[in-house]
């Protein structure tokens, strides 16, 4: 039996039992409710794991955090969990390979559609050259979105030699979940992704065709 717990509204209900809550900012926040329902005690270790999931999914409480999110964070602090340490370890601490990989992506960044779209990518060769570890690309797509006047940030990173993961972020009005769905993926209105094949240029053009349908 396959049980699916998810907070993505684009979930296709592929499990035998599906618990989908697209309002929840993180799967870990769904688990908190389940633990309470089944009267499972949330220990300090469990709270640390749940808080790690919430911090990474909300990018440090920046996206979709609710009052319940902050109430749980307060309870975690009362248990003695060092939330600032989780934040530093997951979102702030960088190694040299991470820095070099990000630098390559920023050097390639293009601003398209009158500056409303930021696009960049890294290659498998880039990862090998700098000695990157899994996850060293995290955060690149957010930087593109944070540039003034950018509405949509598009970032590609390799999935071995099979293709690319396209990550999409939007600032205000573009629904990137719909764009990801058109590419075979899914996600949230302002954060989504998909696995795609082709060259970075080919993938860029496919994504731009969908983005243009929503740009104002």
Name the predicted role of every residue range:
Residues 7-73:
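Short alpha-helices
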Residues 6-7, 187:
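Short, small-residue-rich loop/turn micro-motifs
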Residues 56-182, 187-216:
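Hydrophobic helix-and-loop "lid/oligomerization" segment in the mid-to-C-terminal part
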Residues 3-5, 17-20, 118, 154-156:
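Hydrophobic/aromatic beta-strand patches that form the interior of the parallel beta-sheet core
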């Amino acid at each position: 039996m396959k049980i699916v717990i998810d907070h993505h509204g684009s979930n296709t209900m592929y499990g035998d039992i599906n618990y989908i809550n697209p309002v929840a900012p993180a799967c870990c926040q769904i688990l908190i409710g389940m633990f309470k329902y089944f009267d499972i005690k949330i220990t300090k270790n469990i709270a640390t794991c749940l808080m790690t999931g919430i911090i990474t999914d909300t990018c440090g409480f920046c996206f979709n955090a609710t009052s319940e999110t902050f109430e749980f964070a307060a309870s975690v602090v009362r248990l003695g969990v060092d939330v600032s340490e989780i934040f530093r370890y997951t979102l702030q601490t960088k190694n040299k390979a991470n820095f070099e990989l990000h630098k390559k992506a920023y050097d390639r960044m293009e601003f398209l559609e009158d500056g409303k779209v930021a696009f960049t990518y890294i290659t498998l060769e880039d990862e090998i050259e700098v000695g990157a570890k899994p996850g060293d690309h995290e955060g690149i797509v957010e930087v593109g979105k944070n540039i003034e006047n950018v509405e949509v940030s598009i970032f590609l990173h390799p999935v071995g030699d099979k293709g690319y993961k396209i990550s999409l972020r939007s600032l205000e009005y573009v629904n990137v979940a719909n764009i990801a769905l058109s590419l075979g993926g899914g996600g949230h209105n302002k954060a989504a992704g998909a696995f795609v094949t082709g060259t970075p240029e080919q993938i860029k053009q496919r994504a731009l065709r969908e983005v243009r349908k929503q740009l104002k």
